[in-house]
């Protein structure tokens, strides 16, 4: 009975919109209003389609070993990048795959949280329901917003977008979100905007042979002087990129920017030409941010550590994220997150 009722509701809404289009065409000048009308119609029809797909979606997942605690003991954080209609390579995920990921998580009982809720949980100041998790996106790519938002909307989910502010606010790119789009995202109530650096999301030359390494974790080769940066020059370059992005986004949105996603997931923990890079970065993060995010890939199976309460932490919290890409299977993703819920320190 319930499914028949839903189908009747969908059909009724479709008829209402059809009548609206006919009436609008009779009384309004479509040369002025057609774009807004058709965008609204397309948006609502897509929403109806997604709701119908969700109603019939099914996935069999393993939740037999999950914790039975009344409250969340760990919080899993996912990170996506671009969401093109068809994904060609890492780290992109297709719109269809993303939809299946979120449908499966919703069907499995998972609900999203905000950055504020995550911070309170990590500090031990707040309890969250079991199966709470956070969705994040890096880079501020247009497809991440346009293809994710309709799915977030029908599931009543929210997400965080980490923006490279110099690419979005200082340029009018066809690839990165612009300022108007970012404000539109915030206005939906489904998106939080945070920092992914100013322009430091690129590789820099580290020697006179043209070898390159990530911006944040290495000293830059100064060709003019035929040498590497000094310690102070490195510090000032990183300080500028971090503070510029935080201040630029904060001023633009009139909101506090208190979270940062590490570009290239590299803070000198793997390979660097400056052994003190990670210490300097940690000091700057403690100065400017409450939460700092980095990617984490499980080495084998489901053996990975999620994010736990840490009341003794005195600086920025390092938040581990599960990196999602073109190869991430829907069932294995849900099984991974389910497995993390059962692990205790």
Summary of predicted features, one role per range:
Residues 78-83, 164, 195-199:
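Short loop/turn segments at strand-loop or loop-helix junctions that form parts
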Residues 137-140, 197:
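Active-site metal-binding loops of divalent metal-dependent hydrolases
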Residues 158-178:
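A short, conserved beta-to-alpha structural element at the edge of catalytic cores
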Residues 17-29:
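Hydrophobic alpha-helical membrane-insertion segments, chiefly the h-region
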Residues 27-136, 143, 205-345:
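C-terminal active-site subregion of NodB/CE4 polysaccharide deacetylases
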Residues 177-219:
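Active-site cradle of extracellular carbohydrate-active enzymes
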Residues 149-156, 177-195, 282-286, 307-314:
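Acidic (Asp/Glu)-rich catalytic clusters
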Residues 1-17:
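N-terminal Sec-pathway targeting helices
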């Amino acid at each position: 009975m319930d499914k028949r009722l839903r189908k009747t509701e969908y059909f009724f809404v479709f008829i209402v919109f059809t009548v609206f289009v006919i009436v609008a065409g009779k009384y309004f000048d479509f040369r002025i209003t057609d774009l807004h009308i058709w965008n609204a119609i397309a948006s609502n029809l897509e929403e109806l389609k997604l709701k119908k797909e969700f109603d019939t979606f099914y996935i069999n997942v393993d939740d037999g070993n999950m914790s039975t605690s009344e409250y969340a003991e760990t919080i899993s954080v996912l990170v996506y990048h671009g969401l093109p209609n068809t994904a060609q390579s890492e780290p992109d995920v297709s719109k269809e795959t993303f939809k299946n990921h979120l449908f499966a998580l919703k069907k499995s009982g998972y609900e999203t949280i905000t950055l504020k809720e995550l911070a309170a949980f990590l500090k031990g100041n707040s309890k969250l329901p079991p199966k709470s998790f956070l969705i994040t996106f890096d880079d501020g790519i247009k497809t991440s917003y346009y293809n994710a938002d309709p799915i977030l909307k029908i599931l009543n989910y929210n997400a965080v977008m980490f923006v490279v502010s110099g690419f979005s606010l200082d340029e009018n790119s066809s690839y990165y979100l612009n300022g108007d789009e970012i404000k539109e995202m915030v206005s939906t109530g489904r998106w939080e905007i945070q920092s992914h650096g100013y322009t430091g999301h690129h590789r820099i030359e580290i020697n006179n042979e043209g070898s390159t390494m990530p911006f944040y974790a290495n000293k830059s080769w100064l060709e003019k002087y035929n040498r590497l940066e000094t310690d102070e020059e490195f510090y000032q370059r990183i300080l500028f990129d971090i503070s510029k992005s935080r201040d630029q986004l904060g001023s633009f949105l009139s909101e506090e920017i208190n979270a940062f996603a590490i570009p290239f997931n590299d803070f000198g923990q793997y390979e660097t030409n400056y052994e003190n890079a990670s210490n300097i970065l940690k000091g700057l993060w403690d100065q400017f941010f409450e939460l700092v995010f980095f990617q984490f890939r499980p080495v084998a199976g489901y053996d990975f550590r999620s994010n736990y309460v840490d009341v003794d932490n005195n600086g920025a919290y390092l938040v581990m994220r599960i990196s999602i890409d073109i190869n991430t299977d829907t069932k294995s993703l849900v099984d991974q997150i389910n497995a993390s819920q059962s692990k205790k320190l």
